Amino acid sequence: MKVGIVGAGMVGSASAYALTMLGIASEIVLVDYNTDLAQAQAEDISHAVPFVSATLVRAGDYGDFAGAGVVIISAGVSQKRGETRLELLGRNAEVFRQVVDQVLAAAPNAILLIASNPVDIMTDIATRLSGLAPQRVIGSGTILDTARFRSLLGRYLEISPQSVHAYVLGEHGDSEVLAWSNAMVGAVPLMSFAKQAGKPVTDTVRSEIDAGVRHAADKIIKGKGATYYGIGAGLARIVKAIASDQRDVLSVSSVTAELAGVTNVAASVPRVIGSSGILMDLVPDLDETERIALAKSARMLKDLALSVPC
């Protein structure tokens, strides 16, 4: 599959690198307003190709997206000093208006994969601007938060995180909901596994893992300025599910007809991903506290999305 990437910064280039390492894409085209950056990133990544795959990695312009099955959008503007979140969203909506039009002019059949933050709102904006069915506009959502949740649980339980089945729902941000009540390890409920393994999940353990998930980005940004490897791998994982029609269950964002009593809101739940995009939404059974938290998260996202004209 040919993959286009808008934005050759840290996230865009990390996703291109992950796609190359995994051999998922036959061709990757990087587009950025800074053409020198796009060219340099493409050249650097292409030098890794002989070691791992046969992917063609190059820089180009929007017209070079022709025939792409997926286009990752990681473009956006940075927040100015004194600028409100709403003002920033308005400027990013304007960027997306230009980007989405040019992407679809070249690749009208592509699935859009949104990585720009705040990703849920930008997914909503991209859906409105594109006129595409929500199933074809996918935000990275809580795929990284879910990976962090599983990683921390696996580390505590001394089990492979790939055997941990637990999800983060709602916003990719402060109001996200860690779905503890239905977390599983293999075929065993989390609390049962923890008891059998002699690793009880106490309130203190839950609190530490919750904080570890919520504040992971802050810790990484403090140390190195940005996060990009994790989300780059997450984006590659979504593309893999599409390219191979794997029908995998991944926690991604999309405009949802109804979630926790809120209509037409972009938020994350587990979703089945295949060659045509989102095939099915899966809303897990939650306890009362989690249901209330998810409703609050969905309402906050809906209100914020409505405040952004596009």
Curated annotation (Swiss-Prot):
Classification via HAMAP family: Lactate_dehydrog
The organism's place on the tree of life at top rank: Bacteria
Catalytic activity: (S)-lactate + NAD(+) = pyruvate + NADH + H(+)
Assembly and interaction partners: Homotetramer.
Cellular component GO terms held in the UniProt record: cytoplasm
Family membership noted in the UniProt record: Belongs to the LDH/MDH superfamily. LDH family.
Function: Catalyzes the conversion of lactate to pyruvate.
Binding site for NAD(+): 11, 32, 62, 76-77, 115-117, 140
EC number annotated for this UniProt entry: 1.1.1.27
Record's protein name: L-lactate dehydrogenase
Pfam families: Ldh_1_C, Ldh_1_N
Means of activity regulation: Allosterically activated by fructose 1,6-bisphosphate (FBP).
Residues bound to substrate: 79, 85, 117-120, 145-148, 227
Active-site residues from the entry: 172
